[in-house]
Amino acid sequence: MKKVLKKVTAATMAATMVVGLAACGGSGSGSSDKSASKSGKIKIGVSIWSSTDVLGSQCKKILDEAAKALDVEVQYVDQGHVSEKVTASVEQLAAAGCQGIIICNSSDTEMTSAIKTCNDNKVYLAQFFRVISEKNSADIYQAAKDSDYYIGAVHEDEPANGEELVNILLEKGDRNIGLIGWEQGDATWLGRWEGYKAGVEKWNKENPNDKATLSEPQYAGTTSEGGSKAAEALMAADPDLDALIPAGGGGDPLQGAIAAVERAGKTSDIDIVSTDFLPDLGERLENGSMAGESGGHYCDPLISFMMVYNAIKGNYKDFGGKFEDVPFPYLYVSSPDDYKAYEKYFVDQLPYTDEELVDMSKLSMEDLKATAAKLSIEDAASRAGN
C-alpha cells in the first residue's frame, strides 16, 4: 500500500519509551556536583532509557544542538526503563545541580517519586514521550497538577498510532499478525496495544469473512536480542504468521526482529511495521524488510526541554494547579519515496536551525504548543525555503 506522509491529528489526545546510573556525556562537563550551575549556565538533566540506541541518539542530537544554541549545560542519565533506576536518576540529576529535568519514565508510578524529588529540591520537571494518565493514575496526576515544579508532558497519541500501523498491514493483506511488546505495564506500550487491537476489531467487524488475528504479545525488553527471541517464538508458534509488529522500545528490538525474520528466510513472507525510524529505513522499505513505520518524533523531548528552560528563566511560571498537556505528531512512511522526503529534512539535517531554536526558546507556552503540533515534513521544508 502506498501512503503519503501525514501527521496524527492530536486535538483530543489523552493518554499515552543500560547503562546503570552513569551519566552519559552531553553538552558541558556532566560533573556530579552542584558546582556546574555556579558557572552561570543553566543546567538541565535528561533521564532517558538510552541515549545511544536509535531513537535515543536522535533525541540526544537535537537536545545537544538546542543546548549549544542556548548555552545550556546538559547531563544525561541512561536508566533502561528499570523502575528503581528511573527514580534514582531524578535524585542523581537533582544532586548534580540540575535546575530542571526532563524525563522519559516507564510507568506512571515512578512519577510519584520523581515529582517529590523535584519538589524537595526546587527543580522543574517535564515528561517527554509520556503523560500521566488522569484516568488510570488519578492520584499521581493530581500530585503533578498540585506541584509548583511539575510543568507538564509532551506525548503522542499512541492508540491512534497503533491503529494506523495495524491498518497498513491489514490493507496489505496480512491476517496473522504477531505482536512484540517491550516492558509490561509501560504506558506508551499499552496505548499502542490498545490501537492495534482496535484496528483488528474494527477490520473484523467490517470484514466478517476475512478476519485477522493479533497474537498475545511476546516481550523483548529494549534489546536487539530480546526482539530476535520474541520474533523467533512468534514464528515458531504460528507457521502462517504473515506480519510482525515490534511495538517499540527504542529501535533495538525492531532490529533484532528483522534479523530473525531474515535468518528464517521469510523477509518476503512477513511484513513488519513498527515505531521509531531506523537509520536504514529507506533501504528496508526498498528491499521489503519493512512495510511501514511511524516515527520522526525525536523532537518531542526538545519541546519538554524548552518548557523546562523557560521555567528556569522565569518566563513560564505559576505551575501549581495546572498540567500542561502538549500533543506531538507522528510521521508515517510506507514507501521509499515517503522516506526520501523525511530523510532530506530530518536525517541529512535537523528540522530546526540554531536560529530557529533560539526563536523557539522565546515563545509563549501556547505558541510552543502550536509549534509542536505543526511539525511535519511540509513544515520543515517550508522553513528550509523549499
Predicted region positions:
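A residue-level marker of the well-folded mature domains of exported/periplasmic proteins
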Residues: 2-4, 17, 24-386
